[in-house]
């Protein structure tokens, strides 16, 4: 039940004993002081009279302090404060997340710039290494060609040397044959 319905229900309960008293002719002033139905009754009205154009009845102001709940359906005021505190903490956490997200985006932009710089430097180093490798390859190719040329010259020299040795042995044989022959005198 809502608060307004509870008060209307209590009002109906109060009207029944008063109606009985009027029928019996008993004064409500004399009877109401000792009747348990009339003890400690306070009514709270919403602004119904203002809507109807009537004058508002004086009602006792409810203090701003918490009072213990009289009904099990009424929520204690500390719960409202706790929920409000949780909402405030949630809002602060949300603001903190926004600030951290902005900080992360700024750092991400800075790191992107640094990474682009590193990429350019790596590209330059890669090009330099590639140029060095090409020069080294050309150098090795020229060394290989020189080695091949020297080997071919050595092979020619060896064949020439073998031919010279062969000629030398033949010349030696010819000399020996000539020395063994009698010397003819010229006449």
Swiss-Prot record:
Residues 49-71 are annotated as: Disordered. InterPro entries: MCEMP1. Expressed specifically in mast cells. Found primarily in lung. It is a single-pass type II membrane protein. Keywords: Glycoprotein, Membrane, Signal-anchor, Transmembrane, Transmembrane helix. The keyword Cell inner membrane does not apply. GO terms for cellular component: plasma membrane; specific granule membrane; tertiary granule membrane. Glycans are attached at residue 124. GO terms for molecular function: identical protein binding. The keyword Transport does not apply. Residues 107-187 are extracellular. Its main location: membrane. This is Mast cell-expressed membrane protein 1. Signal peptide: none annotated. Residues 1-85 are cytoplasmic. It is found in: Membrane. The chain crosses the membrane at residues 86-106.
């Amino acid at each position: 039940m809502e608060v307004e319905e509870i008060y209307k229900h209590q009002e109906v309960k109060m009207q029944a004993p008063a109606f009985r008293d009027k029928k019996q002719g008993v004064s409500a002033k004399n009877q109401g002081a000792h009747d348990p139905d009339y003890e400690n009754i306070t009514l709270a009205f919403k602004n119904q009279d203002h809507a109807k154009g009537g004058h508002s009845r004086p009602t006792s102001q409810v203090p701003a302090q918490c009072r213990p709940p009289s009904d099990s359906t009424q929520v204690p005021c500390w719960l409202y404060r706790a929920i409000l505190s949780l909402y405030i903490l949630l809002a602060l956490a949300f603001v903190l997340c926004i600030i951290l997200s902005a900080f992360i985006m700024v750092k991400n932009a800075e790191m992107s710039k640094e990474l682009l710089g590193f990429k350019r430097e790596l590209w330059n180093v890669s090009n330099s290494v590639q140029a060095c490798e090409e020069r080294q390859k050309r150098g090795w190719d020229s060394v290989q060609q020189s080695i091949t040329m020297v080997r071919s010259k050595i092979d020619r020299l060896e064949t020439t040397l073998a031919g010279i040795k062969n000629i030398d042995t033949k010349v030696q044989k010819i000399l020996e044959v000539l020395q063994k022959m009698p010397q003819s005198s010229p006449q």
